[in-house]
Design a protein with these regions (language model features):
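Hydrophobic, aromatic-enriched alpha-helical segments typical of multi-pass transmembrane helices
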Residues: 2-236
Length: 237
């Protein structure tokens, strides 16, 4: 697939989710929430609260952006040292696993439940008929009960580290591409570093800044493609 097609899809997906994020930042759609979890008669509780409309609107972005970004990184990695490029790409692919699991988890909850109907007693429901009524939901909730292995937490924890490592590796990749194309090298490395910092140290509305950075990177690549000629072709065909 041509770079122009890939980057255009990334740009449209990011512009779309930026609009969605701005809408929900203003409070749009937050009057209807889904609350799933448990509370114990002996103390303690665990809940997950989601906005169904946001989950459904975010789904097309998740599919489109991560698919085409993976294709984009696959093109970028071949222009540097094979070991570095492959390591960065593998780390990126590993980081997608928790994103996929969380997306399926969120879609399952908002499509199966309404309001707070599934915020129920641990002893009187989830540890009895809840196990058979909603086995997938119990699998997710049980990881947060007592001393059980919190596999969801571990998955997200190591997934975040893989994502940070992938961004760091690709920051180096883009920095090495500076000699071949200054605009791509600077824009790519900057977006990777900003993504690392705002993921490690979240700020209010930091995700808006990340969206804007990716839009800037896509715009820079499309601009360089437009300038490309037979004599001076762009580094990414």
């Amino acid at each position: 697939m041509k770079t122009k097609t890939i980057v255009t899809a990334m740009l449209l997906a990011t512009a779309y989710v930026l609009l969605v994020n701005l809408m929900f930042l203003s409070g749009f759609g937050k009057d209807e929430m889904v609350k799933v979890g448990w509370y114990s008669e002996f103390g303690g509780n665990s809940t997950t609260t989601l906005c169904p409309l946001y989950v459904w609107l975010n789904f097309p972005y998740t599919v489109c952006f991560y698919f085409f970004t993976t294709l984009f990184f696959a093109k970028v990695k071949v222009h540097v040292n094979k070991w570095l490029g492959e390591t960065a790409f593998v780390l990126w692919c590993v980081s997608l696993v928790p994103i996929l699991v969380n997306t399926v988890y969120d879609l399952y909850m908002v499509s199966s439940f309404d309001g707070d109907e599934m915020y129920r007693s641990l002893e009187n429901y989830w540890e009895t008929e809840g196990k058979s009524d909603y086995p997938f939901m119990w699998l997710l909730l049980s990881s947060r009960v007592g001393n059980n292995w919190n596999w969801m937490n571990d998955l997200n924890y190591y997934g975040n580290w893989a994502l940070w490592a992938a961004f760091l590796a690709f920051a180096i990749v883009f920095a090495l591409l500076f000699k071949k194309d200054k605009v791509l090298g600077i824009a790519g490395a900057t977006v990777m570093v900003v993504s690392i910092l705002l993921n490690m140290f979240p700020l209010p509305c930091g995700y808006i800044a990340i969206d804007l950075c990716w839009i800037a990177l896509c715009a820079a690549v499309l601009w360089r493609l437009r300038q490309s000629s037979f004599d001076k072709p762009f580094v990414l065909p």
